Each structure stands twice: as C-alpha cells, then as structure tokens.
Amino acid sequence: MVYITYNTPETVRQITFEELMLGVDIPLDSLRSGGHGSTRTVVCSKVPERIMKITYLDAMISQLKMFNTCYKDLIDYPNKWELYDHFEIPKKTGGKMRPIDAPHPELKKALAQLKDMMSGWMFADHHTCAFAYVNGRSTKDAVIKHQRFRSWYFCHFDFHGFFPSTTLRFVLKQMEEIYPFNLILEDPIGRRELRRALSLAFLNNGLPQGTPFSPFITNVMMIPFDHKFARLLNEFQSGKCNPDGTPITDRICYTRYADDIHISCRVFFNYRKVERELIAMLHELDAPFTLNTEKTHFGTRAGRNWMLGLMLNKDGDITVGYRNHKILKSTIETYFKDRRNGKKWDEEDLQKFRGNISYYLSVEPATIAGVIQKYNAKYGADLLTCISNDLKPKAA
C-alpha cells in the first residue's frame, strides 16, 4: 500500500486519479504546483506505471549520497546539542514556555537543503487537511474551512509531545507507505542513505522545534493519518439512528495545524467517540506521541469558540476577539499620545506593534482598517506611516 499525494490546480480538479493514470493529456509534472495548498491523496497497491516513468530513483539515491558526503562532519558530529542555540518562548496560550532549538547557520543550511531536496521529489508534501507550514496557508485559512462548512459544534484535540516524541524509527516506518520514499526504502542502498540523511534532523531522539526541516517532515509523516482520519470523519456514525433503524451519518469537517486538531459539524455529534477513534488510530500507527485528553474541548459557536488564536463567532465571522480589539485601540491611543509628547517607543515595541496590526488586518481587514482610520482622523496623522518613519534609522 502506498499513499500518493499531489497538488490539485484547476486543470485537474475535476479529473480522477484513475483518469490521470490512464493518460489524460495533462503532464504529471503539473501536479507538483498550484491548488493554493489544496491536495489530493490516493492509496494504491503499488506506484502506477505512469508515475514510475517519471520517478528517477537512481538520481534520488545519488542526491542522498552527495548530501551525506557534503555534510559528513555534521552528521557524525559527536554532540549535536552543541550545534544548536537553546532558548524558550512563551506559548500563545500563555503560561507555559515552548523550548526552541535553533540550529547554527551551517546546520540550518543543511536542513533547508534536505527539505528542498525531499520536497522536490514529491508531487505534494502535505495532506489537504494540513494547514501548518504550508505555503499560501495560514491559521485563518484553517478556520475558514470550518466557516464555509457552516459548522455549529466544534471539538479541539491536542497531541502531547508531537515534535520531541517523534523518532527516526517512526518517520522511516511512515515513509515506507509514502511515495516516493517507499521506493527509496525498498532499495538497500537507498534505505541506508535516507536513514543517514534523516539522522541529521534529530536531536536527543526527537524532532527539535526551530529547524526548517521538522515542520516539513511532520506534514509528510502524517499523510497516512490525515487521510485515514479525514475519510473516517467524512461518514462518521456517532451511534444515532433514523426511525427505520439505519445509522445517521454526520459529515464532519477536519483540519490539523501541527499538533492541533479541530473538527466541526453542523449538528451535535459524539465527540467522545471521535476521541476514541483518534486514540485507536494513533495506536494502529504505533505513534510515539499521544493524545492529551485533558485539552480536549467541545463547544459551539455560541460560546468562546477559539481556534488557533482566532474566534469563529455565533454570526459566523472570524475575528481576533473583543479583548484584542480593546487592546489594539488602547495601544493606538497610547502611541499617538506618546508621539505627540515626544516620547519615543523602542524599536522592538514598534516592530511588535506593527506586526500585530498587520496580522489583525489579515484577519479582519475592513474592521481593523476602520479602527485605524478613526484614530488617523482623531490625531490628524497616518498610523502606519508614523510607525514606518519611527522605525527608519536616524542619520548620524
């Protein structure tokens, strides 16, 4: 069994995989791009002949050999801990800190090269339900999927130890069913070289957070899980029945953002049964990480329905929340008053302020633009221009 994932640009959106394999007049290389992050995953007993014809296995193994030769000193470095800077940043949810292992420049370069090389071998490197670390996708895009589904009931699940618990053994096991890595692993030399190259990406037998490779490889290894779980939820039988005794099927929307899973439905559903199915699927995959059941949360749009730092409210609108609106208005007011009184803000504070404004504008463009215009009129100045001017280096 092999999972093949490809991008779905408009030209192939209505064409089945079987039609593509039968020789529809569309070059298969066109499946490597387009679709704005939307992909399709199919499961085959083996890699189809048409795909095998454009799969250059010997070249892939040669690239792995060259990579391993080029970065031999890094791969064999006795204490990889010394190749990283280690620090902590606050989690968005507040309270706890998130450990970050930032690779030194040479290692970062090597891991970025490994990511680009492996990603280039695939038609697409993520399932369509995965939204984290995907070009052209954001947290808002994940929430929009649930918004378009017109869901009312929501449940959030969280994986425990997603990055630090992921082992090289688990990644290789998953790759045995993911094209084209399954072909590389069938070759003894390919298996040896792939294992050696991947070993560079691990620290203390886990994936470090802070490298360009860890996010990529988690999306790849989760393709089988995402595919199975999405199919399960597409025809989920929660135990309810029609008057004639036939089971009621609830179609459930599913998105995954790294270790955050969100599911939603237009009608009430048995989220505890979903939780049990999720745990069973992790056991089936022999996953090294677990479900943090203490963080499972079920609710409706009528309540505080936060998703990935955004709120999908009872009216079906995506917002940054009332409290963030209030803080933004207060900060703008303070900034304009300080500027009028000649009090300068630190560069770090200005950068953070501008970043927050940019993010809020991406979430609620009309609402936030209206807030800014209100204060621009009140103080007779353009907020964003003022911030840019204050960030310009002053002449010596």
Predicted regions and their residues:
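Short beta-strand->loop micro-motif that forms the acidic, two-metal-ion catalytic signature
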Residues: 259-266
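Short beta-strand
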Residues: 252-256
